[in-house]
From Swiss-Prot:
Lineage, broadest ranks: Eukaryota, Metazoa, Chordata, Craniata, Vertebrata
Residues that coordinate or bind Zn(2+): H30, E33, H127
Protein name as annotated: N-acyl-aromatic-L-amino acid amidohydrolase (carboxylate-forming) A
Keyword annotations of the record: Cell membrane, Cytoplasm, Hydrolase, Membrane, Metal-binding, Zinc
Residues where substrate binds: R74, N81, R82, E189, Y300
MF terms (GO), sorted A to Z: aminoacylase activity; hydrolase activity, acting on ester bonds; metal ion binding
Catalytic activity: an N-acyl-aromatic L-alpha-amino acid + H2O = an aromatic L-alpha-amino acid + a carboxylate; an N-acetyl-L-cysteine-S-conjugate + H2O = an S-substituted L-cysteine + acetate
Subunit structure of this chain's protein: Homotetramer.
SUPFAM superfamilies associated with the record: Zn-dependent exopeptidases
A GO CC annotation given for this chain: apical plasma membrane
Subcellular localization(s) per the UniProt record: Apical cell membrane; Cytoplasm
Coiled coil: none
Length: 328
């Protein structure tokens, strides 16, 4: 293929997308995940000192769950990051409604009603995990080219920790996380960090990811062409609980030392999963190799989850650039 034909092919492969009106940066969806709480507060301080011009694009900052933040708890009544499905957002509010359901509906109205034309273009929801996951971007669609290109951009720029992409691939109406309210939302999950603690190194990684997201949006809106290519993603398959006593439901084992802190490793049949409190090893019985993540996450004990399992895929994303009058 000649150079001219190759260039023409690449040009034809480009996808033209509308400019992005801005981003909502949300912290404190879980009130004891403090990197996002302090980053949102710092961004609000910068805006107060320097005005909206501190960023090259419109940025909305949101402290998502202020009551939980004040009490440094994950939530008050129920996990708010499970309250953004269409069903929950349309639930009538009564005197007995959980605080987080009320707040989720407030945020839905603040950021644009989920599924409407006026919804926020992008939500970046900030989270910490006690698991050793580095920086993980979590979103709902394997065909959202904007989000995948931002993931790809962060992977090229951030070198201090692994940057991975996790796709949940749920129907958007069933998607229950805050970022699902927007057109191109994702969660930034950074760890390990204990609940109720802020670590400087983890905070810095989160801040760099937010700054780079804003930078990507500004460049995209300004006409930069982002070349396509392959993106390695992990797709959620299922959750695994701890071994339990069948009568009391108490745990009978902990995550095996050979698995602990090895999020996204390749897990094969026969590999150690758990070490029972009586000293026996429980091994993996999966038929195909999978990748565990959120290993021994502190917040998941109440949910009956020791870790999730994912399958690794390679997605090919097209080149993208902003849609203009000439390209429309």
């Amino acid at each position: 293929m000649t150079e001219e034909k190759a260039e023409e092919k690449n040009k034809m492969a480009s996808v033209f997308l509308p400019a992005l009106g801005g981003v909502a940066v949300c912290g404190g969806t879980h009130g004891n995940e403090l990197s996002g709480v302090y980053l949102v507060q710092e961004m609000e301080r910068q805006r107060k000192e320097r005005g909206d011009g501190v960023w090259p694009i419109p940025v909305t900052t949101v402290l998502s769950n202020p009551r939980a933040v004040k009490e440094c708890r994950r939530y008050i009544d129920t996990d708010m990051n499970r309250c953004f499905s269409k069903a929950v957002l349309s639930t009538p509010i009564t005197d007995s409604s959980p605080y987080e359901v009320r707040r989720a509906q407030e945020l839905n109205n603040l950021l644009g009603v989920k599924g409407s034309d006026d919804v926020m273009d992008m939500i970046c929801d900030l989270h910490n995990t006690t698991s050793n996951m580095g920086l993980t971007l979590i979103h709902y669609s394997a065909s959202d080219w904007v989000t995948l290109h931002i993931c790809k951009y962060l992977q090229t720029k951030i070198t201090k920790v692994p940057v991975r992409v996790l796709v949940l691939d749920f129907p958007i109406n069933d998607a229950y996380n805050l970022e699902s309210v927007s057109k191109h939302g994702f969660t930034l999950e950074v760890g390990p960090q204990p609940q109720g603690v802020v670590r400087a190194d983890i905070y810095v990684i989160m801040k760099e990811a937010v700054d780079l997201t804003i930078d990507w949006i500004h460049k995209f809106n300004s006409g930069t062409v982002f070349e396509g290519g392959d993106v390695e993603v992990f797709k959620f398959i299922k959750s695994v609980d701890y071994p339990r006593d069948p009568e009391t439901r108490n745990l009978t084992a902990a995550v095996h030392p050979q698995l602990q802190d090895r999020d996204f490793c390749l897990l094969k049949r026969g590999d150690p999963l758990f070490l029972s409190f009586s000293g026996e090893t429980v091994t993996c019985e999966e038929e195909e190799p999978l990748h565990p993540f959120f290993i021994n996450e502190g917040a998941y004990y109440e949910k009956g989850i020791a870790f999730h399992l994912a399958k690794k895929w390679t997605l090919t994303v097209p080149s993208v650039q902003v849609q203009t009058t000439n390209s429309a």
